[in-house]
Each structure stands twice: as structure tokens, then as C-alpha cells.
Amino acid sequence: MRILWIVAVCLIGVEGNLFQFAKMINGKLGAFSVWNYISYGCYCGWGGQGTPKDATDRCCFVHDCCYGRVRGCNPKLAIYAYSFKKGNIVCGKNNGCLRDICECDRVAANCFHQNKNTYNKNYRFLSSSRCRQTSEQC
């Protein structure tokens, strides 16, 4: 399933929420940083189960939960307004659903930045067999 997410990110056009989320991550952590989070731990990438492996993986768990609360539009496809101001992500004037998606992505990108010291290369492309514990509730 994670491979499908990678393909989806690669195939998405110049706009679209996943592309915008990738730009937020790269803006906070540097060019091409998004590739470090596409398949990481138990929650970064498509789907998720088990217990987050570290603070970085927990950022993805919280992001998944946030997307799960969004109502009224598709979080992975909707296009929202945002910008960077003095290194900070600022969500623009969006309606309720788009505002919620932007906030989910902004919080996750900031979380990755705040927890970059917990990033563990051993959790990249982690086998799903290492994520079989009972999943936490959002």
C-alpha cells in the first residue's frame, strides 16, 4: 500500500493537497525532505496501524487522525490557500473544510521539524509485520 502512496504523490499534478503537504514539509525541512516521510514507521505513508515507533511516526499518526476528522471534502485532493511567512506556514482564507485540511498539514509539517532529531533511518520502509500491535485510538 505504501508504494501506491508514493505513486500517487509522483502522479499528482502541480496542485492538489498531497503536493501542497509535500511543499510544506520541504519548506520546513529543506528540499526533497518529503521523501524521508513517504514510508516511515507505522503511520507515515498510506494507511497506518499499530503503535507509532517514535515522535516522528507519531506526527503521522496525529496527521492521520486529523484527516479522519475532516468533513465536507477529500483531504488528499482538496486545494487550499497557504503561504510561508518568515519561515512559518500560514493557512490562508479557506472555507471550513479547506481550513481544517491546511491546519492538519501545517501542524504535521511543524511536528516533523520539531522532532527531526528523533528521525531513525531504521524505520524507513518498515515492514508492516513490525506494526501489528493494537492500534491506538485517535
UniProtKB/Swiss-Prot annotation:
Task: Give the primary localization class.
Answer: secreted
Native organism: Vipera nikolskii
Task: State the protein's purpose.
Answer: Monomer: snake venom phospholipase A2 (PLA2) that affects neuromuscular transmission presynaptically. It has catalytic activity, anticoagulant activity and weakly inhibits ADP-induced platelet aggregation. PLA2 catalyzes the calcium-dependent hydrolysis of the 2-acyl groups in 3-sn-phosphoglycerides. Heterodimer: shows the same activities as the monomer, but with a lower potency.
**Subcellular location per the Swiss-Prot or TrEMBL entry:** Secreted
Name any one GO molecular function. toxin activity
The EC number(s) this enzyme carries: 3.1.1.4
Under which name does UniProt file this protein? Basic phospholipase A2 chain HDP-2P
Q: Identify its protein family.
A: Belongs to the phospholipase A2 family. Group II subfamily. D49 sub-subfamily.
Quaternary structure note: Heterodimer of an acidic and a basic chain; non-covalently linked. The toxic basic protein has phospholipase A2 activity (chain HDP-2P) and the non-toxic acidic protein functions as its inhibitor (chain HPD-1I (AC A4VBF0)).
Q: Which PANTHER family match?
A: PHOSPHOLIPASE A2 FAMILY MEMBER (PTHR11716), PHOSPHOLIPASE A2, MEMBRANE ASSOCIATED (PTHR11716:SF9)
Q: Tell me what controls its activity.
A: Enzymatic activity and neurotoxicity are inhibited by Triton X-100. Triton X-100 has been determined to be located in the center of the hydrophobic channel of the enzyme.
Enzymatic reactions: a 1,2-diacyl-sn-glycero-3-phosphocholine + H2O = a 1-acyl-sn-glycero-3-phosphocholine + a fatty acid + H(+)
- What is the tissue specificity? Expressed by the venom gland.
User: Which keywords annotate this record?
Assistant: Blood coagulation cascade inhibiting toxin, Disulfide bond, Hemostasis impairing toxin, Hydrolase, Metal-binding, Neurotoxin, Platelet aggregation inhibiting toxin, Presynaptic neurotoxin, Secreted, Signal, Toxin
Annotated catalytic residues = H63, D105
- GO CC annotation: extracellular region
**What are the cysteine partners in each disulfide bond?**
C42-C131, C44-C60, C59-C111, C65-C138, C66-C104, C73-C97, C91-C102
